[in-house]
Amino acid sequence: SYRGLYVLCEGNMGSNKATLDYLDMTTGRYSRNIYPSRNPGKVMELGDVGNDIKVYGSRLWMVINQSNRVEVASAASAVSLGSVDIPNVRFLAFDGKYAYVSSYVGPVNGPSVLGEV
């Protein structure tokens, strides 16, 4: 069963202010901007314009549109597992062991592997 809810806050375009918030549904406590505190040795701000968020398996996937990145973290702890750089990434979906992303960078000639986390 779920014990909480992640909220990806978009932030203002051009300000590098996207944040990840968390609502603990067992206590009702809402925590703002948890990503830097969960990743003290690595993380700064999440990036510019949080656009999409999904939990798939044990991972939390966050699309940071204007930063051209998909950030991947542990769904249980929000600790960063890595990221994949994708120009103008917008949305993501999953099927089996693959994540599919949309991008408005231009035409695509076929599927390609952009990264692995």
Please give the residue ranges for each predicted region.
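An edge-strand/N-cap motif at the start of beta-rich repeat modules
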Residues: S1-G28
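Conserved beta-propeller blade signature
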Residues: G4-L8, R59-V63, Y98-V101
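Short glycine/acidic-enriched loop and turn motifs that connect beta-strands
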Residues: G11-N16, S67-R69, V105-G110
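Structural recognition of the beta-propeller blade-terminating site
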Residues: D24, V72-S74
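A short beta-strand motif characteristic of beta-propeller blades
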Residues: R29-E45, A76-V84
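Short, intrinsically disordered low-complexity segments
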Residues: R38-N68
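Repeated scaffold domains used in trafficking and secretory/extracellular systems
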Residues: V43-D52, I86-K97
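A charged, solvent-exposed segment within the mature domains of Sec-exported extracytoplasmic proteins
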Residues: N88-V117
